[in-house]
């Protein structure tokens, strides 16, 4: 345990403070400038609080480069600098209800009366400033070091939640948080891991890394969102409280987090904290605490700020939800693109409301950095409240005979040599006949966003492949009822149901087939753009790299991947076989040249889908809504116009009812779609 500062000499304190500054500044550089932290927040906070303690006891030790005097990071090369006329400050932190009570007591003693507080969720993202002149968006910037940030205007203009024009012609500088929703983060990491690229540690890093992309097309693809919560200068607004300011923001067209609450007592504040500490895993985005702000705006102005933090607000940081467990094994598995991924197998533990027994170790570089070994006691947490991740190893409990993990040199599925492709951190099997890759490819082909063959999952596909009934996707369409009845747990009715689902998938539009084929870098959105442009698979197969790259500024990486895929003789044979079994290879959706239906009732509406839909898939419903001019949102807020609720709808439906938002059941939505088709 560290010595108490009041028992130390100045020299001892100076030595420790210097070491802490060096360590903390290096961690800050990794966090802010590289978007790649190498230490848990709780460890950083512990070191930071120790430095604060030393500097408070020995004020002469405070230096201009101390992390206690700095805000954010440096300005990254490649972006123009933006000077914030009014600095973008960070927040002070507390870690216990007792510390929070002390902050409130000091504030109220200072002003001489009790204060109402606005409680807001602390979004785990990247601070953002948006500048509007006469109601028009003219600039977006990062916080940077608080005084000078990065001009990311081109990137933020691709984010759907940021209005290009306000509902009033105000000249304002609005601050908020840019974040990546949990679902978008999980999908992005899945794509990166499949492509052999380094994964992001958490949604905050993913959002920061995305906003700092020099190619704004990448930003557009990654589904970032924002919540705005503050303003540089209160004057342009009519609001007199923090809570009313958020409502005014929403009226201006900004996305705000609707889950704020005005607290009239500390009992209200603590109740809010307890509620969202429990609800945290259920939210669609990551939070790492609660922000408590004095609600009256005139009081905020009179209290002002220190060089680093406002005096009228504080962040209550949630304690890390970590559990120790035993690492029993490491399994190496092969994905559909050939990437070989290590997975830690552990004693099951309860973490953030779920039982966790497995965690990805991503790639050999990650394994080496963590130095995990069989038999280790490890600390497990959920990165961004989503993905189980080993945060550290308890070296004191490491068995004496524990050995470093052996990185495989041959494929665990087919035995082919593993390779490192250029610019990849992943190990990859490049044998196209690898059984694991073939099976994973079949699973992907049948998945909901691809050919949507209901009932054809990994268990049945494994049996079909093992029994040599299917060796490629075309073989699915040659299956017979007699063959299906030879499989385990397949009876007469389920065989007929599966054959019906397979038969129905023959009529899917071309974009589903393209996505289902598993072409590298071709996700569902890219597949739709390509299908819209070319119309038929024959036209696509004859297209040049330049033609494909020019589609909606798609670029060379995707175009090269598509061209290389269709250069294969085996792929040509597969396409002919699919056509021979009557699988559709033409595009059947709305034309790329036809604008969204501006005359539709849905035009301009913000719609949320929730619950289980029986008549159609969620992607199909989303595509239909978008084609009719709607914006499909991931969460319910005061700005939501309509919620379409299937069966087993949960918190989104409840929130819609609380906010008095129009709710349709699936039957009404289906009827609307049918009427539109007949019109």
Curated annotation (Swiss-Prot):
Gene3D superfamilies, per database record: 5' to 3' exonuclease, C-terminal subdomain, 6.20.10.30, BRCT domain, DNA ligase/mRNA capping enzyme, Helix hairpin bin, Nucleic acid-binding proteins
Keyword terms: DNA damage, DNA repair, DNA replication, Ligase, Magnesium, Manganese, Metal-binding, NAD, Zinc
Domain BRCT: 597-679
Active site, per annotation: 122
EC number(s) given by UniProt: 6.5.1.2
Catalytic activity, as annotated: NAD(+) + (deoxyribonucleotide)n-3'-hydroxyl + 5'-phospho-(deoxyribonucleotide)m = (deoxyribonucleotide)n+m + AMP + beta-nicotinamide D-nucleotide
Residue spans crossing the bilayer: none
GO biological process: DNA repair; DNA replication
Classification via SUPFAM superfamilies: BRCT domain, DNA ligase/mRNA capping enzyme, catalytic domain, Nucleic acid-binding proteins, RuvA domain 2-like
GO CC terms in record: cytosol
Cofactor(s) annotated in UniProt: Mg(2+); Mn(2+)
Amino-acid positions noted as binding Zn(2+) in the UniProt annotation, renumbered to this chain: 411, 414, 429, 434
Binding site for NAD(+): 41-45, 90-91, 120, 143, 177, 293, 317
GO molecular function: DNA ligase (NAD+) activity; metal ion binding
PANTHER family referenced in this protein's UniProt entry, alphabetically: CHROMOSOME TRANSMISSION FIDELITY FACTOR 18, DNA LIGASE
HAMAP family: DNA_ligase_A
Annotated family: Belongs to the NAD-dependent DNA ligase family. LigA subfamily.
NCBIfam families associated with the record: dnlj, PRK07956.1
Protein task: DNA ligase that catalyzes the formation of phosphodiester linkages between 5'-phosphoryl and 3'-hydroxyl groups in double-stranded DNA using NAD as a coenzyme and as the energy source for the reaction. It is essential for DNA replication and repair of damaged DNA.
Name used for this protein in its record: DNA ligase
Protein encoded by which gene: ligA
